[in-house]
């Protein structure tokens, strides 16, 4: 398997999300932080649903977590993930049992839109 780099955007569109005030809907209001937290919560839900992860999957999990945290701290709108880590992230979104809502839908669109897939 090739180990290409996949690019994941952290610019989540918050327009039209109920329960958010106007300040939070502005493009610069930590959209990357919100997107990163949603992605990390989905990964946690996936891991909990499986009652833990294998060592190989934990390494991918930590890689994605650390990459997202660094991107938020550095105010990056896009992150690069190795194809293995990106595949693991997509698996988390596919297999985790989640309650559908509009903001999750938008986060799923970011993951589905990773360049290179």
Predicted regions and their residues:
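Positively charged, low-complexity terminal tracts
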Residues: 1-117
């Amino acid at each position: 398997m090739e180990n290409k780099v996949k690019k994941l955007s952290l610019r989540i569109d918050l327009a039209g999300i109920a329960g958010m005030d106007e300040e939070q809907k502005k493009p610069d209001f930590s959209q990357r932080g919100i997107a990163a937290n949603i992605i990390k919560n989905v990964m946690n839900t996936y891991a909990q649903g499986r009652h833990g992860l294998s060592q190989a999957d934990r390494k991918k999990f930590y890689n994605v977590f650390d990459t997202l945290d660094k991107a938020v701290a550095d105010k990056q709108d896009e992150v690069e993930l190795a194809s293995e880590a990106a595949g693991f992230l997509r698996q988390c979104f596919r297999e985790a049992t989640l309650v559908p809502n509009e903001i999750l839908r938008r986060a799923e669109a970011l993951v589905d839109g990773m360049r290179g897939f």
